[in-house]
A protein has these predicted regions:
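Positively charged, low-complexity intrinsically disordered leader regions
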Residues: 1-10
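Conserved N-terminal subdomain of the carbohydrate kinase-like
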Residues: 6, 35-116
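Short pre-catalytic strand/loop immediately N-terminal to key active-site residues, enriched for Gly-Thr
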Residues: 10-19, 220
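Alpha-helix C-terminal capping segments
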Residues: 24-35, 80
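Active-site beta-loop-alpha junctions enriched in small/polar residues
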Residues: 93, 117, 147-151, 178, ...
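Conserved phosphate/ATP/ADP-binding segment of small-molecule kinases
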Residues: 138, 152-220
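Short beta-strand/loop segments at the ligand-binding rim of alpha/beta enzyme cores
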Residues: 139-146
């Protein structure tokens, strides 16, 4: 998913940029000249046009972005603290018909990145599973980033079976300590890996803001 982030420092808006966990990763790869594709949706409106233009400027094809005629493109307000950590408020008005788009052709060792609530949303689950099944069939590498926000922490138990299913599909799981605080109320990296990740996926990358990145595998 991509969304237009309106960034606030203090109480004043300072910028408006397309964002999203998976989207930000794709943007970085596109800027490096790596061949990428992005599956998403946006509205036929000014916000949607900003997102599509940003993609083109960063060498990301828009072939697999569904532009829906009804509803509105999603927007978030991101309030940054002194450490530049963001607290989000989301505004979304999607149509009933979702993600009506053809998936790109996958090949062995392609990397498929999925994440955020987009990969958990019951409305989109059938399409997400279709993509994950194609990736598994073609022997692509599945990279899962939960990017679990505080706005969904009260749904964590209800979403747990879907999270587990995503972990089972994943070849690599990358999450932040903040994600696992909201998902499991856990902050110990070793305990998160041993109790929540390892059984489903042996490869785990955990970030902690400005602190060191941690790697856990069945060999490390």
């Amino acid at each position: 998913e991509t969304i237009l982030d309106i960034i606030f420092r203090g109480d004043q808006p300072s910028a408006a940029v397309p964002g999203g966990s998976v989207f930000n990763g794709i943007v970085s790869l596109g800027r490096m000249g790596i061949n990428v594709g992005f599956i998403s949706e946006t509205g036929n409106d000014r916000v949607g046009n900003i997102i599509l233009q940003f993609m083109r400027e960063n060498h990301i094809p828009t072939d697999h972005v569904n532009v829906f005629p009804d509803g509105k493109s999603p927007v978030s307000l991101a309030f940054l603290n002194e450490q530049s950590d963001a607290e989000y408020i989301f505004y979304k008005d999607y149509p009933k018909q979702r993600l009506d788009v053809l998936f790109p052709k996958l090949e062995e060792d392609d990397i498929v990145m999925v994440g955020s609530y987009y990969a958990l949303n019951p409305v989109l689950r059938e399409k997400i599973l279709e993509l994950l099944d194609q990736a598994r069939e073609k022997k692509a590498i599945i990279y899962y980033d939960p990017n679990f926000r505080s706005s969904h922490k009260n749904e964590a138990m209800k979403l747990a079976p879907t999270i587990i299913e995503n972990l089972e599909y994943a070849d690599i799981v990358r999450g932040s300590l903040e994600d696992f605080l909201y998902m499991y109320n856990m902050q110990d990296i070793d305990k998160i890996y041993k109790d929540k990740i390892k059984f489903y996926c042996p490869r785990f990358i955990c970030t902690a803001g400005a602190e060191k990145v941690a790697l856990r595998t069945n060999l490390v």
